């Protein structure tokens, strides 16, 4: 029987930063944004210090409400390194669903972007949920309805009243010395909760599922082993990171095998095809509707997909007939 790893997510990240520092880890092909393992690990450490500076610590719940933006993974690993719990928030949530999750999870810090349904959509929903935020000093939020909530972070350069932005979190991290970060890292155990994912709530209220470093890293590792992943692979990830498909089967697979994670911020069949073509991806994840959209795209024949050797098609079965037709 294969022995399971007891490394934490932070251990894995630092392992590859030491052994393959100059190899590309995170790539956004359309933005030409690229992080090597060393560069990404350093950014995560800076962000972890910033979170410590605003009171995030071991056991603190930090929500991430965003599409697949570049710093989504930064915040995930920053939480992991200091023992905090990343709470993944569905990007399709409406006001009531967001409020339920924030209350139920005892959320301390919420990281957001503008949103996908109009300018400042998420920002306005957060202000509606936390009316005290606009008049609060950053880091000192006192909400009657959400007593655990102390911080809101805007992922990006824009500034909103009562919220930190990414640059300010990184700047605050400069006040935390290396020893304090090392002390926080040393307390993290592989059996600590690192991620809380909420169920769909089909037959009742969604329930927060508490997942450990040991749980999700080994899940991703074994998935990759079945797919014969190595550090030479490049996985194109166009599925949402808030879902287990993105944050576990994709991200943890890449993390535990040292391979490159080619990110697509929001699903677009043309962008997926272009990313696979440009980066010579060897694996692609998606659901049947995504694969059908890619295969039926009028520009499909313009792209070279020959580098692909494996992938995962999830959700529902893709009939042999349809596969044969394409």
Task: Kindly give the residue locations of the regions a language model identified.
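AMP-dependent adenylate-forming
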Residues: 12-36, 156-160
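Conserved pre-ATP/AMP-binding loop-to-beta segment of ANL
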Residues: 21-24, 145-149, 153-160, 164-198, ...
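Conserved AMP-binding/adenylate-forming core of the ANL superfamily
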Residues: 25-77, 94-99, 103, 165-174, ...
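Conserved AMP-binding A3 loop
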Residues: 34-38, 185-187, 191-218
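Structural core segment of the AMP-binding/adenylate-forming
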Residues: 54, 82-171
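Adenylate-forming
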Residues: 112-134, 239, 265-270, 281-322
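Conserved small/polar residues in nucleotide/adenosyl-binding loops
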Residues: 199, 319-326
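Conserved AMP-binding/adenylation subdomain of ANL enzymes
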Residues: 217-234, 242-283, 293, 297-298
